[in-house]
């Protein structure tokens, strides 16, 4: 197969903050209340520092080469992109250095890592599974979308290993370690059906479970297709957008089309639905669940407008395009407690809505960081589930078209944000409330595969 890998680009040795299309537009009252300060063409709270930025570079710098999700392992960050993925050395977070950039088009290239393996989600028909395959749209043959698997033992030269086709492709996937230590499972989420498509037949009220033998990744295959709901959701759309697993607790929370779903994953191949929750008044597109450390709360997001609309402007209700905080009881039942939305009003042409985030490992507190597209990066304290509040933020000014932070995750003392058009941002929060998190070091992070930290 054709695989273009660009390794060790020295241009990243001295990353600089790029100029945005225009100046920031933070609501003055919100900025003042947060102790905001300006830094070049960005605005941030006084407790947040913009440490570094690595702008997009070839071959992942085309007009549709959008930055997407993130994963971490040791001193490396892995950044998905509509056109492939990048590997960065972040041993010095102030100077991220490119190790390799792999050209492998397939939107949206949602990414995860485990040991020497890297996984990518492809949710757009291709003429084949390899990286050289053309798009299957616009009259092409179509016929493949799903999961691509790479060997990353040599991070300067990632190697394509195999691929697995899944119905309706893979919009996102969640890595769940097998209990025998010899396999990992990927819970594959995607919307559907598409009646005219050869890759997404009706009905589509399910997910796909892909089993990957870690010693033989070429043997990866679909081992089950659990049905999570009866029929398709609203407007005939079924399936799930994404799933967050908490393997230690044998739990997963799925954000699906029409509802949130709590699952028992003690049997990795056959997850069992425990509860459906709906919010017909405030939620549109369920998205991005996050458990707290004790698994006594779950935060769901509402991606109203699909990430391309302005839902943080004055014309959108504060509980729309927001987060909802649920209690999770010992009996494993969800109960709605409160809502959160960033307090900084955005312009009517800035795409902004709740998106991907992760916990900060602060003992005794429930704190997470989250991306909000052009609304920036928000640090949220939801310890009081009835009254979640923002305690820090980072935000650029408006850009033309779709932009902003796709994913923002905390990893070993820093926040890493994948900006759709501006590249990789590294942030640091210095605050007595969050400083205990700096003492916690982990070896690997896939944000949708939660692990516990010391209480």
Model-assigned labels for residue ranges:
Residues 3-5, 9-455:
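Feature marking well-ordered beta-strand scaffolds used for ligand recognition
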């Amino acid at each position: 197969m054709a695989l273009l890998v660009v390794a060790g680009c020295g241009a990243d040795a001295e990353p600089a903050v790029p100029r945005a299309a225009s100046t920031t537009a933070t609501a003055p009252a919100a900025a003042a209340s947060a102790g905001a300060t300006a830094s070049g063409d960005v605005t941030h709270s006084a407790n947040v520092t913009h440490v570094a930025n690595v702008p997009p570079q070839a071959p992942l710098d085309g007009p549709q080469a959008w930055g997407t999700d993130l994963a971490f392992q040791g001193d490396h960050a892995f950044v998905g992109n509509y056109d492939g993925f990048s590997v960065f050395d972040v041993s010095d977070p102030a100077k991220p250095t490119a190790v390799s950039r792999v050209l492998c088009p397939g939107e949206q290239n949602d990414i995860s890592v485990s040991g020497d393996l890297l996984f990518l989600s492809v949710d757009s028909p291709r003429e084949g599974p390899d990286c050289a395959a053309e798009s299957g749209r616009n009259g092409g043959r179509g016929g493949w979308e799903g999961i691509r698997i790479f060997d990353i033992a040599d991070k300067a030269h990632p190697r394509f290993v195999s691929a697995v086709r899944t119905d309706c492709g893979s919009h996102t996937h969640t890595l769940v370690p097998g209990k025998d230590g010899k396999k990992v499972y990927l819970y594959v989420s995607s919307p559907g059906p598409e009646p005219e498509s050869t890759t997404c037949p009706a009905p589509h009220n399910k997910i796909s479970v892909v089993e990957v033998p870690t010693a033989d990744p070429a043997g990866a295959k679909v081992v089950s297709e659990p049905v999570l709901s009866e029929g398709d959701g609203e407007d005939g759309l079924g399936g799930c957008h994404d799933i967050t697993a908490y393997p230690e607790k044998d739990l997963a929370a799925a954000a699906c089309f029409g509802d949130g779903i709590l699952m028992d994953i003690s049997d990795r191949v056959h997850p069992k639905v425990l509860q459906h929750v709906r919010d017909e008044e405030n939620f549109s597109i369920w998205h991005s669940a996050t458990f707290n450390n004790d698994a006594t709360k779950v935060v769901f997001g509402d991606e109203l407008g699909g990430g391309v609309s302005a839902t943080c402007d004055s014309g959108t209700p504060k509980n729309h395009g927001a987060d909802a905080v649920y209690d999770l009881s010992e009996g494993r039942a969800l109960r709605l407690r409160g809502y959160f939305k960033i307090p900084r009003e955005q312009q009517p042409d800035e795409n902004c809505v709740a998106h991907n985030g992760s916990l900060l490992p602060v003992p005794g507190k429930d704190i997470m960081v989250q991306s909000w597209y052009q609304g920036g990066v928000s640090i949220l304290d939801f310890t009081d589930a009835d009254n979640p509040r923002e305690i820090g933020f980072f935000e650029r000014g408006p850009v033309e078209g779709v932009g902003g932070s796709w994913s923002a995750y905390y990893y070993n003392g820093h926040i890493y944000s994948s900006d759709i058009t501006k590249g990789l941002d590294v942030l640091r929060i210095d605050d007595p409330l969050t400083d205990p998190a700096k003492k916690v070091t982990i070896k690997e992070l896939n944000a949708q595969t939660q692990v516990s930290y010391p209480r």
